Amino acid sequence: MFSSSILTIISSIDNFITIIVNNLKKWWSDITLQTRIMAMTTLMVSLLMSSLPSGLKLISKQETRLVDNRFGKDLSLLLAVNITPILEGNNYLQLQQFIEHFYLSTSSIRYILVFNAEGQIYYSIPFSSETVVNLFSLSDYECLRSEIYYFSNTPIVNTPNHLEGEIIDIIIPLNKEKKLLGVLNIGINSNPTLTTSSQLTRDVSVAVFVSIWLMVILGAAFNAFTITKPIRELLTGVKNIASGDFHQRISLPFGGELGALIFNFNEMAERLEKYEQQNVEKLTSEKAKLETLVSTIADGAILLDKDLRVILVNRTAIENFGWEGKDIAGSMIIDYLPEDINQQLFPALNDIVRKNFLEQSLCETQEICIKLQKNYKKTFRVLLTTVLDYKYSILKGIAITIQDRTEEVELNEVKNQFISNVSHELRTPLFNIRSFLETLYEYHDSLDNRQKLEFLAIANKETERLTRLVNDVLDLSRLESDQEYPLQSMDLVSAIEQTVRTYQLSAKDKKIDLHIDIEENLPCILGNYSLVLQILANLIGNSLKFTHSDGIIVLRTYRINDSASKLNSTPLQIQKVRVEICDTGIGISKKNQERIFARFLRIENYVHTLEGTGLGLSIVKNIIQKHNSEIHLYSELKNGSCFFFDLIIAKDT
């Protein structure tokens, strides 16, 4: 556990050192080359200048040490000459007095040690014998005995490190007629001026080093505030202007040429800003004109750039593709178009881009017809036109014009169906009339009167059928014109009874119960009598046509109150008469309910069992609109249908 803790600590220290090294490397790499060269030059100059006092100090120290060594040798020889006779006479008291006197009279002596011939301490000052044993290694003297013997009275100079301060340690043998009497060890303090000069030299070196760096830093700061800062401000301003930001200004209190440069820069930026504002206003005005023009176009318009991103789209295109509330400007067109449109449109767009960029050919306008069949049926006519830079023939964008031809296609289909139906309906009675008349003409001698009357009756019936068909077409044409139909007070009950009497026999033949339910005292309504008769006839006729035997048809009328708003927002109750024609017929699907009132459309187009021109309900809708009302339908497939509309009650009622 202890070893794992140590490993964890070592790993943490290693990671810490790695982080520091990496940060230093990153810091150094972020420094510019010019700054690195300046820093290295400053470091070399500062080290060189600060090393000069140290060199002088070293030379002075060597000279002082030589002087101290000579002084120590002379002093030790003088002391040895005086001590040798005393040591020879083994006069310890005299030796003690002499050495103490010599020690006290000479301030430069740090200590005096006297050893006998066996290397034992004979006398020491100012240390005791125990201290000498602890501080000095006596084995050194044992090693020197042989050397001392041979070198006679030659002093040996050492520099001990077991005492504080600069000390010259001198060892001199005490010989008498080549007999070793002992060893004298003197410690002499070094010249105090040497220590003082060393400290002064160190302080001067540090001061020189710091002064050089301080001067460089102050110079760099002065340069940064007086030259570098305005240059950086100018560089930033130039970059901003190059990027299109003309609001950049420099406000620095400088005079001279630098101040003139700043002033001219600000003046240039101000002129560019005014020029940009003028261009923006002009472009905005032109864009507004273009958008207004595009928005008034009935067709959808989309402008793409060369990367097929939307630049402009008008209201018609937004409504066609359901882009209300979506900000598609700057987005890829394929991200917002339905999938089936993309499948047909995107290859054409890619083909235009490819021809203009790869083949360098000018692509003419392309026309595409797109039919949607999935969610809803729509037909679009799409025109793709390239937008080129005619100076360099480079593709700048693609203009897409979208024409919604759904209604046109549907009308063409309905018209074709109508023509087919009318042609068939006209051909059938005409063929029947012609056949029976030709038969009467060719075989009139062989036919009896009963057969002739029967043929004439059939021809007359077909003539009536042909007349109704022509009348329906004429009625619809007349109703869709601007012809005015006067509305006046009329008896609705009378019109209902007249219509019911007309169709009562047909209902009886089909075993259908035709029932009327009229509210008592029903007031007169405001309408056109002949047109109201036509409404009732068409609706009852349709009910009879689509109701099977044993079915029921109910015609119901009653009064209702309809709320309308006056100018002061106070509700105004308007009395109306509601007319309902309900049956238990085949019913109408929800899909067909939305189109049942369209022109030229018949429900039998989907049933294929009944006859008709498909104009009846369209005529009814137009007549009711002439009466300032709307017709409504509620129907369930195979359960029946109910048509109802409201008519305004006449004021004189």
Curated annotation (Swiss-Prot):
Its EC number is 2.7.13.3. It comes from the Eukaryota. The modification Phosphohistidine is found at H424. Keywords: ATP-binding, Chloroplast, Kinase, Membrane, Nucleotide-binding, Phosphoprotein, Plastid, Transferase, Transmembrane, Transmembrane helix, Two-component regulatory system. GO terms for biological process: regulation of DNA-templated transcription. The chain crosses the membrane at residues 39-59, 207-227. Residues 421-651 form the Histidine kinase domain. One of its GO terms (cellular component) is chloroplast membrane. The keyword Membrane applies. It is a multi-pass membrane protein. GO terms for molecular function: ATP binding; phosphorelay sensor kinase activity. It catalyses: ATP + protein L-histidine = ADP + protein N-phospho-L-histidine. Residues 225-277 form the HAMP domain. It is found in: Plastid, Chloroplast membrane. Residues 286-356 form the PAS domain. CDD domains: HAMP, HisKA, PAS. The keyword Transmembrane helix applies. This is Uncharacterized sensor-like histidine kinase ycf26. The lineage of its organism: Eukaryota, Rhodophyta, Bangiophyceae, Bangiales, Bangiaceae.
